[in-house]
């Protein structure tokens, strides 16, 4: 099945306390329409991590998928950077 049309995001893992699920925060910079200043906005996603590889602090790439639970609509695609912290 072709997966080219699914949305992908890059974010930082903030929690791995759930079974096969990680919480990832994605920072988005938007320009204020009136003043032109860049404003940082954050959004948290619950991402399915089948092999439980990602740890807090890791930079991950994840993609859209079918609904896996009430809150999970994304799955882990690739770990881009492993964090050095012991958490």
Swiss-Prot record:
Question: Which GO terms of the cellular component aspect does the record hold?
Answer: cytosolic small ribosomal subunit
Q: By its UniProt entry, which CDD domains does this protein fall under?
A: Ribosomal_uS17 (cd00364)
Q: Does the keyword Coiled coil apply?
A: no
Q: Name one GO biological process term.
A: translation
Sorted keywords for this record are:
Ribonucleoprotein, Ribosomal protein, RNA-binding, rRNA-binding
Q: Does the keyword rRNA-binding apply?
A: yes
**UniProt cross-references to InterPro entries, sorted A to Z:** NA-bd_OB-fold, Ribosomal_uS17, Ribosomal_uS17_bact/chlr
One function term, GO molecular function aspect = structural constituent of ribosome
Q: Name one Pfam family in it.
A: Ribosomal_S17
Q: Where is the signal peptide?
A: none
Going by the entry's taxonomy, the superkingdom of the source organism is recorded as Bacteria
**What binding partners and quaternary form does the record give?**
Part of the 30S ribosomal subunit.
Q: Which family does it belong to?
A: Belongs to the universal ribosomal protein uS17 family.
Q: What does this protein do?
A: One of the primary rRNA binding proteins, it binds specifically to the 5'-end of 16S ribosomal RNA.
From the Swiss-Prot or TrEMBL record, give the protein name.
Answer: Small ribosomal subunit protein uS17
Origin organism is Aster yellows witches'-broom phytoplasma (strain AYWB)
